[in-house]
Amino acid sequence: MPRHAPIPTPRPAPTKDVFGAAAKEVLDTAQRYLSNPVRHVVISPGSETVWDDCCGGTLYVRVVSVSPVTQANAALGTCALLGWTVTMALGTVRCASAIDSQGRAPKDKDLTEDALYLTQDAADLGQMLMCETNAANVSWAPQGPDGGCMSGEWQFDLRVGACACPETR
């Protein structure tokens, strides 16, 4: 376990994790909208999600970036924070048809079925984003297929409120 530098006193009171809370809320809501079940439901760390068990299906959300929204006169003082713009990605990982053990390519009907499975996920999650969140700058993109897996994810911005500036203890 890495050791961390001591925190000087006085120090700010702990801050509520509004980014993680927003990700969890999006994920919980998205589960209710999916037409096709998934085995895994995760908040993914980092810039990508794991494709290891794609045939079980994965619903994921990840935080892509965070930017402060400040008052126009932010340079004049401290605590000019109005909120945060949290860019997130919400998607699914699914099984995709692949070359079989005898080197034969997947059949057309199987590839079409795969594509329609993914576009159904896109429709379900897109509907959720438009009906249940304040999402802006919303776009969907497929990924893969690769190694028998495929994915599609929505990227979008959420406006998350800011807490009052912390007081020192």
Each language-model region and where it sits:
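Small/polar-rich, solvent-exposed N-terminal microdomains that initiate assembly or binding
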Residues: 1-80
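Short, solvent-exposed segments of well-ordered alpha helices
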Residues: 77, 81-84, 109
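Oligomerization/assembly interface segments of phage tail-like spikes and tubes
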Residues: 82-97, 150-162
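Acidic-leaning, charged glycine-interspersed low-complexity segments
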Residues: 31-40, 51, 111-164
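A solvent-exposed, charged loop/short amphipathic helix patch at secondary-structure junctions
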Residues: 5, 100-115
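General secretory precursor processing signal
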Residues: 57-58, 82, 134, 152, ...
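Short, solvent-exposed secondary-structure capping/transition elements
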Residues: 95-103, 167
